[in-house]
Amino acid sequence: ERGKQPSFLLEDSGYGEQYHDKWFALEYHQAHKPVLEQTEAVGHAVRAMYLYSGMADLAKASGDEALFNALKVLWTDVTTKKMYITGAIGSDEHGEGFSIAYDLPNDRAYAETCASIGLFMWARRMLKLEWNSNYADVMEIALYNGISSGMSEDGKQYFYVNPLEVNPAKVHQR
């Protein structure tokens, strides 16, 4: 009965088979597979971080070990194959999201400030689920290299993207 088990992820598990989006595939929205079957971070990086943060909140509230294990698999994928040394994520400028494993270009890095904020949020929630210094390390890296560096000193302006290498002649294109 609806409302007895308030987990949107379970209620919505059959969604997606008939979905057709003119502009974005299901991967963009992380809706290509049920979350428990996802093993690779795909699609829009900020959306993924919000989804994974929500999954972590649900795992914490419900004690769902399968959900936590799925999160650990996604965590490993993001932090070992799709994260820059600066803690930035989302290397693909087309779709503002994840690319293939180890595709981390310095000059074309999208690496949104928002994605670093999302990564920090997800890492904090993972740390609440499991005392593991890896989560705290990623929080620190994201905070100092992706969040604070994405804001002006007065806090009134932000960098949208944070590439590791910039060609001054092409800055206006981004």
Label each PLM-derived region with a short phrase.
Residues E1-R174:
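Glycan-recognition and catalytic cores of secretory/periplasmic carbohydrate-active enzymes
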